[in-house]
């Protein structure tokens, strides 16, 4: 679990921590385990805060037994997720905020509106050569810091190694 204080400190610095704590925040971190089992951080990835969930499923890919067809299917799911995001972001009110992760995979959104939103990461995001995608709900309540951890277990699509 990430330290909320350390994430805020990395974004606003020691002088701005008092002011930062006065606002509403969503803070989070991104990491996966690579094939060797080592933690790899989502460095310099675009992260989006959006108002609505994009329908997506890779179930058909997981049932595929032929390796190359499975890889192709997962790649197509990542591309479809990207295209759906591109279409939805044109809708008024869909894209709430955008940020970029730090070198250690941390990110923050300052003063998001109250309510339930989704933290979204999509193609062309890569971590350690893996395509990754997330769409995780987060609820913003006034005076509370929302925390989101994006990792292997809550990927919206299977990670796929880029070859």
Which residue ranges define each predicted feature?
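Bacterial N-terminal signal peptides
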Residues: 2-15
């Amino acid at each position: 679990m990430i330290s909320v204080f350390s994430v805020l400190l990395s974004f606003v610095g020691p002088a701005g921590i008092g002011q930062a704590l006065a606002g509403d925040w969503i803070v989070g971190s991104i990491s996966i385990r690579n094939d060797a089992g080592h933690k790899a951080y989502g460095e310099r990835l675009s992260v989006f805060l959006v108002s609505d969930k994009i329908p997506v499923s890779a179930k058909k890919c997981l049932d595929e037994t032929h390796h190359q067809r499975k890889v192709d299917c997962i790649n197509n799911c990542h591309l479809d997720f990207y295209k759906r995001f591109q279409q939805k972001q044109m809708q008024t009110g869909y894209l709430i905020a955008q940020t970029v992760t730090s070198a250690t995979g941390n990110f923050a959104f300052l003063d998001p509106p109250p309510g339930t939103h989704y933290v979204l990461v999509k193609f062309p995001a890569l971590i350690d050569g893996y395509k990754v995608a997330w769409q995780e709900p987060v609820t913003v309540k006034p005076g509370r810091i929302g925390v989101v951890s994006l990792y292997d277990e809550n990927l919206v699509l299977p990670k796929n190694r880029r070859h």
